[in-house]
Amino acid sequence: MKFGSFATFAADIEATDADLDVVALVAELFDAADSDLDVVARFVQGRVFPAHSETKLDIGPQLCYTALSRAAGRNVDADDIEARLAETGDIGAVAGSLDLGGQTGLAAFGGGDDHADGLTVSGVADELAALAAAAGDGSQSEKVTLLFGLFNQCTSREARYLARLVLGEMRIGVGEGAVRDAIAEAFDVPTAAVQRALQVSNDYGLVAETARDSGTDALDAMGLEVGRPVQAMLAQAGTVTDALDEWHEAAVETKFDGARVQVHYDGDDVVLYSRNMENVTGALPELVEFVENNVTAPVIIDGEAVAADEDGDPLPFQEILKRFRRKHDVAAMREEISVELHAFDCLHAPSADGGEDLLDAPFSDRHRRLRSVVDDASAVSEVLVTDDADEIAAFEATALEGGHEGIMLKNPAAPYTPGDRGKDWLKRKPDVETLDLVVTGAEWGEGRRASVLGTFLLSARDAAGDGFETIGKVATGLTDEELAALSDRLEPHVRSEDGQTVDIEPAVVLEVGYEEIQASPTYSSGYALRFPRFVSVREDKTPTTADTIERVERLAAQQQQ
């Protein structure tokens, strides 16, 4: 498929408001993609690589601006790109306004597509893969050169969507649900079969190709693969009354203040994945050793990595973040902060045939299998199954006395649904719920804080899942050291500045507390946080897993009850 054809479909989709029409257009795109279907299924969502892939593009805004300005000719520099971006707020619109192939500088907005259409979808994918592979001395220059080469071949429309793609901001209103429904519509397979295949594979391209080439039976035959991560099942806030009214009895567990970890062990290799499916094996060698010595393969285990002191008591969440994703000085940090595995679910376990998927088994059965594959019982969560609210309260009190965060309430009969934040897992905390929000802007501080960012604009994911809506600003709860560290963290993601105001690429997620959620016309979400306060940087989250407007609306509604 020509990249220009993909860009035309993207433009048509972007101009469409109705959800059903979007799905129909995406289905038409998939039907026309031919051998490029796997790539197109990712590109349309703004993804270059499969969600489970360890390959990352690692292109910041400044690198993109440099490549764009070089393709636009000697009369345009990166500052010109930033200035134009400050006016439009859309890197795609800026890229589309440049006369790239002609090397003649800034063109009028809405410029035509006069250049020869030579780019293909597969060619773009190959060049971006080469860009991602660039490493070591001179890699940044190599990335600029490769990206310049792509932009230099682009028409205006192609540049619009290529620029968005490389920065992960496709912004055409296509979320995961639309892609799922489009696969079903394009290849005449049940939506439920597509959903199930996506849950076990986490690969939209693979599922799309399987649906097209082999149909429903092949989708139904897809299963978990040890070594390939799946999305974690998630919990929503709830009460003991909610649980007992809905399920009649609840499985109660301690809620650990740690980082989610998914353990894959095939008998030879142990691989650990974060909640975002990032490989964190190298950062947690003691967990690897524990699994090798105490777990029967093949297995996929869901659990929590928890930092502990010398007595085995839990340390605050911030301590585990000092270990998570660490690539240097791992041995030294291990001496300072030890990490323990607290396993609470089993997705795949040994069987007579080699291995068995357990996603459809009830939680009570999965937990029983978990106990059978982990020799060290202390590493497996304690579960109380009861219909007695007083017993649950006593269990919660014990968990809190032990320094833990609270309790989890789970439906004993529920299957494991990857990526789903449903009503079968409820988290009960003694404190008001916090929100995990994306930093999309900031303001420079004043006085002694004039050299650092002092106020941060917060956004939640929109309903489509590929954009963000503002919900408030936070400046409370950060020390001078935290402000400096957060400013350094955000600096590579700055897109433009206008006086005290800074526009920031969505990249960093903050956990934010608040007193109340109020309706407000001040922010694009229609809501504002009353007395927001910084709690922590969510190192284990990305913008795609931050909280949604839907969750904000639900929490706001709960306040009124």
Swiss-Prot record:
Taxonomically, the superkingdom here is Archaea
Matches recorded under PANTHER family: DNA LIGASE, DNA LIGASE 1/3 FAMILY MEMBER
Q: What is its EC number?
A: 6.5.1.1
Names of the cofactor(s): Mg(2+)
Q: How is this protein named in the record?
A: DNA ligase
- GO molecular-function term, one example from the UniProt record: ATP binding
Q: Where is the active site?
A: K255
Residues binding ATP are: E253, R260, R275, E304, F344, R421, K427
Q: What does this protein do?
A: DNA ligase that seals nicks in double-stranded DNA during DNA replication, DNA recombination and DNA repair.
SUPFAM superfamilies assigned to the protein according to its UniProt record, in alphabetical order: ATP-dependent DNA ligase DNA-binding domain (SSF117018), DNA ligase/mRNA capping enzyme, catalytic domain (SSF56091), Nucleic acid-binding proteins (SSF50249)
**Family (UniProt):** Belongs to the ATP-dependent DNA ligase family.
Q: Coding gene? A: lig
Asked if the Swiss-Prot or TrEMBL record annotates the protein with the keyword Cell inner membrane, the reply is no
Tell me what reaction this enzyme catalyses. Answer: ATP + (deoxyribonucleotide)n-3'-hydroxyl + 5'-phospho-(deoxyribonucleotide)m = (deoxyribonucleotide)n+m + AMP + diphosphate
Keyword Calcium appears in the UniProt entry? no
Q: Which GO terms describe its biological process?
A: cell division; DNA biosynthetic process; DNA recombination; DNA repair; lagging strand elongation
